[in-house]
């Protein structure tokens, strides 16, 4: 392609609304164009990158025996109501775009396709002889993000590969899960990316287990905790660990202490000269279920620990049926204004004890009359601890469970693991932290959707059984931007060779020099005929502008038909290393073929 004929406009300055390097560079280099909040046009260079990523994904999926298809983006609400996720996606998380058609039928723009594929399986799979089966698609998805940001990282429209598998038993499901683990590792490796596979929370998708594939980058939204022995890695939302040991309490006699102005852990520890590891803090949450029922949740946890709200939400979702509900609509720490809707009197915030009286909750049929009390294991293990006295300005010291306070019935793991914690598999290993961009996620769904939607098959004994399912997603457009976030410098993008829009760019420093133009045309033709995807910068611009643009767009190899042609050579510059060398004109094609093959093969 000739740049003079291409839609190619670069920017010298960073766009004001771009926050992270990859977003800035893709806009500046003319790869994408913002159309609206969270909405981007993929311009010609970007579309080539996306096609290459998609092809790698397609090859790896096909190699496992998965079959490509294409599912409708518009989905009937009735299918989502069958699975029980309509309210979760339109009210709780609120990420699904929903609409009503002219027949007054509710529809959703698909953020994911579990319901559609399960309905297809329900209608078409009859016998165990048809299983296992794995279908996938590469398609545009939609999410009504609260705050779209970071370009293609968190947009309202994005390209994704999503696959769904069906099985007769756990062994078959796990085999496909492992196949996908290998395939996803291959996809990222072939794309030239450094990544880490980590244990993950299954979120609204559900299922018994899942793994995320994190592209390592400082701008990543996710925190990954891992051990240096390589035996443990998890998203912080899912991570488990051993906290530091609690210090021995300095208190031996139970008593109430005057502690004015100590609403925070730090202040009470300073006043009482004690460690936060010897304090039980009690955090109040307000959760609303999909049937409108509000439940007040009191979480007791060791003073130096933080509540993992993803783990907490999972625990509360498990309890939904006890309140006549299916799922959670919202979970938050209620502010004073929110508390006024259900309290009979002001709460002693900062001084709440594990036994705060249920009488604080006003009588209301939409509000559960008692606090749901949960305790983290870190608090259960404490002796002679400090905690609130249910009275503003006072704490108690040397308290114990089953003496001064009844231990809550529900003991749960809801603490947030953090760097420095000890690993469970080997306490001598401590957790390290890294930032990551989630590029892929694989799930073992089990029968979550098949049971809810009546998708069954007949086994060898003639019995009707629910299908076991797996679900596997790769963010194609996110992966492409993540590659930029992982590899750039002050001058622009450094694309991995395998997914670069073009392998090489031939730059003519002076288009008025007939010899430069002739050599450039010759190389441009030869390289493309040899399968080396090549751009020709034949614009009437200064050489410096062309060199800067070549660096900005990140094409792996730049060939310059400058002064060296007098000696039968051209200058070839490798973008990643900036190494420059002069190569005989007739040897350029074979040399680049070798370099490109080596760069791609090293990732396979």
UniProtKB/Swiss-Prot annotation:
<comment type="similarity">
    <text>Belongs to the class-II aminoacyl-tRNA synthetase family. ProS type 1 subfamily.</text>
</comment>
<dbReference type="InterPro" id="IPR001387">
    <property type="entry name" value="Cro/C1-type_HTH"/>
</dbReference>
<comment type="function">
    <text>Catalyzes the attachment of proline to tRNA(Pro) in a two-step reaction: proline is first activated by ATP to form Pro-AMP and then transferred to the acceptor end of tRNA(Pro). As ProRS can inadvertently accommodate and process non-cognate amino acids such as alanine and cysteine, to avoid such errors it has two additional distinct editing activities against alanine. One activity is designated as 'pretransfer' editing and involves the tRNA(Pro)-independent hydrolysis of activated Ala-AMP.</text>
</comment>
<comment type="subunit">
    <text>Homodimer.</text>
</comment>
<dbReference type="InterPro" id="IPR050062">
    <property type="entry name" value="Pro-tRNA_synthetase"/>
</dbReference>
<keyword id="KW-0030">Aminoacyl-tRNA synthetase</keyword>
<dbReference type="InterPro" id="IPR036754">
    <property type="entry name" value="YbaK/aa-tRNA-synt-asso_dom_sf"/>
</dbReference>
<dbReference type="Pfam" id="PF00587">
    <property type="entry name" value="tRNA-synt_2b"/>
</dbReference>
<dbReference type="InterPro" id="IPR002316">
    <property type="entry name" value="Pro-tRNA-ligase_IIa"/>
</dbReference>
<dbReference type="InterPro" id="IPR002314">
    <property type="entry name" value="aa-tRNA-synt_IIb"/>
</dbReference>
<keyword id="KW-0648">Protein biosynthesis</keyword>
<dbReference type="InterPro" id="IPR007214">
    <property type="entry name" value="YbaK/aa-tRNA-synth-assoc-dom"/>
</dbReference>
<dbReference type="Pfam" id="PF04073">
    <property type="entry name" value="tRNA_edit"/>
</dbReference>
<protein>
    <recommendedName>
        <fullName>Proline--tRNA ligase</fullName>
        <ecNumber>6.1.1.15</ecNumber>
    </recommendedName>
</protein>
<keyword id="KW-0547">Nucleotide-binding</keyword>
<keyword id="KW-0067">ATP-binding</keyword>
<dbReference type="InterPro" id="IPR033730">
    <property type="entry name" value="ProRS_core_prok"/>
</dbReference>
<dbReference type="InterPro" id="IPR036621">
    <property type="entry name" value="Anticodon-bd_dom_sf"/>
</dbReference>
<dbReference type="InterPro" id="IPR023717">
    <property type="entry name" value="Pro-tRNA-Synthase_IIa_type1"/>
</dbReference>
<dbReference type="InterPro" id="IPR006195">
    <property type="entry name" value="aa-tRNA-synth_II"/>
</dbReference>
<dbReference type="GO" id="GO:0006433">
    <property type="term" value="P:prolyl-tRNA aminoacylation"/>
</dbReference>
<dbReference type="InterPro" id="IPR004154">
    <property type="entry name" value="Anticodon-bd"/>
</dbReference>
<dbReference type="GO" id="GO:0004827">
    <property type="term" value="F:proline-tRNA ligase activity"/>
</dbReference>
<dbReference type="GO" id="GO:0005829">
    <property type="term" value="C:cytosol"/>
</dbReference>
<dbReference type="InterPro" id="IPR004500">
    <property type="entry name" value="Pro-tRNA-synth_IIa_bac-type"/>
</dbReference>
<dbReference type="GO" id="GO:0005524">
    <property type="term" value="F:ATP binding"/>
</dbReference>
<dbReference type="InterPro" id="IPR044140">
    <property type="entry name" value="ProRS_anticodon_short"/>
</dbReference>
<dbReference type="InterPro" id="IPR045864">
    <property type="entry name" value="aa-tRNA-synth_II/BPL/LPL"/>
</dbReference>
<dbReference type="GO" id="GO:0002161">
    <property type="term" value="F:aminoacyl-tRNA deacylase activity"/>
</dbReference>
<dbReference type="Pfam" id="PF03129">
    <property type="entry name" value="HGTP_anticodon"/>
</dbReference>
<keyword id="KW-0436">Ligase</keyword>
<keyword id="KW-0963">Cytoplasm</keyword>
């Amino acid at each position: 392609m000739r740049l003079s004929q291409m839609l190619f406009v670069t920017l010298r300055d960073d766009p004001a609304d771009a926050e992270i390097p990859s977003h800035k560079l893709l806009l500046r280099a003319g790869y994408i164009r913002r159309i609206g909040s969270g909405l981007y046009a993929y311009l010609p260079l970007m579309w080539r990158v996306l096609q290459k990523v998609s092809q790698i994904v397609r090859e790896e999926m096909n190699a496992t025996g998965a079959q490509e298809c294409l599912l409708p983006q518009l989905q009937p609400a009735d299918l989502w109501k069958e699975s029980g996720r309509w309210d979760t996606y339109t009210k709780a998380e609120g990420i699904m775009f929903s609409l009503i058609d002219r027949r007054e039928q509710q529809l959703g723009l698909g953020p994911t396709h579990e319901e559609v594929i399960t309905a297809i399986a329900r209608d078409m799979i009859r016998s165990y002889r048809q299983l296992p089966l794995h279908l996938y698609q590469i398609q545009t998805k939609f999410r009504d993000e609260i705050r779209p940001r970071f370009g293609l990282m968190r947009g309202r429209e994005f390209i994704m590969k999503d696959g769904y598998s069906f099985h007769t038993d756990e062994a078959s499901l796990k085999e496909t899960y492992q196949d996908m683990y290998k395939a996803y590792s291959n996809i990222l490796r072939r794309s030239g990316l450094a990544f880490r596979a980590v244990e993950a929370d299954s979120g609204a998708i559900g299922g018994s287990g899942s793994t995320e594939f994190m592209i390592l980058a400082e701008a990543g939204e996710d925190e990954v905790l891992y051990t240096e022995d390589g035996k443990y890695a998890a998203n912080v939302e899912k991570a488990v660990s051993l906290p530091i040991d609690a210090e021995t309490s300095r208190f031996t006699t139970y008593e109430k202490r005057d502690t004015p102005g100590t609403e925070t852990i730090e202040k009470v520890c300073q006043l009482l000269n004690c460690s936060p590891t010897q304090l039980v803090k009690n955090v109040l949450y307000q959760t609303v279920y999909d049937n409108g029922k509000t439940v007040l949740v009191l979480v007791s946890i060791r003073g130096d620990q933080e509540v993992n709200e993803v783990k907490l939400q999972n625990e509360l979702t498990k309890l939904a049926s006890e309140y006549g509900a299916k799922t959670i609509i919202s979970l938050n720490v209620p502010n004073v204004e929110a508390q006024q809707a259900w309290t009979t009197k002001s709460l002693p915030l900062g001084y709440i004890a594990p036994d705060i009286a249920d009488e604080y909750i006003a009588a209301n049929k939409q509000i559960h009359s008692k606090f749901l009390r949960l305790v983290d294991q870190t608090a259960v293990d404490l002796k002679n601890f400090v905690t609130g006295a249910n009275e503003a300005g006072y704490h108690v010291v040397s308290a114990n469970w089953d003496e001064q306070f009844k231990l809550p019935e529900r003991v749960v793991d809801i603490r947030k693991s953090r760097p420095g914690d000890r690993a469970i598999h080997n306490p001598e290993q401590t957790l390290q932290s890294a930032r990551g961009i989630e590029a892929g996620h694989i799930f073992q769904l089990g029968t979550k959707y098949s049971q809810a939607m009546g998708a069954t098959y007949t086994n060898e004994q003639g019995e009707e059984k629910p299908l076991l399912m797996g679900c596997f997603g790769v963010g194609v457009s996110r992966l492409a931007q993540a590659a930029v976030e992982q590899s750039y410098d002050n001058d622009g993008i450094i694309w991995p060779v395998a997914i670069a829009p073009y392998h090489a760019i031939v730059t003519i420093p002076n288009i008025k020099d007939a010899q430069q133009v002739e050599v450039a045309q010759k190389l441009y033709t030869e390289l493309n005929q040899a399968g080396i995807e090549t751009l020709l910068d034949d614009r009437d611009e200064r050489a410096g502008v062309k060199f800067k643009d070549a660096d900005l767009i990140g094409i792996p190899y730049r060939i310059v038909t400058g002064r060296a042609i007098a000696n039968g050579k051209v200058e070839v510059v490798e973008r990643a290393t900036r190494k420059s060398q002069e190569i005989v004109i007739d040897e350029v094609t074979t040399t680049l073929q070798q370099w490109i093959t080596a760069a791609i093969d090293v990732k396979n």
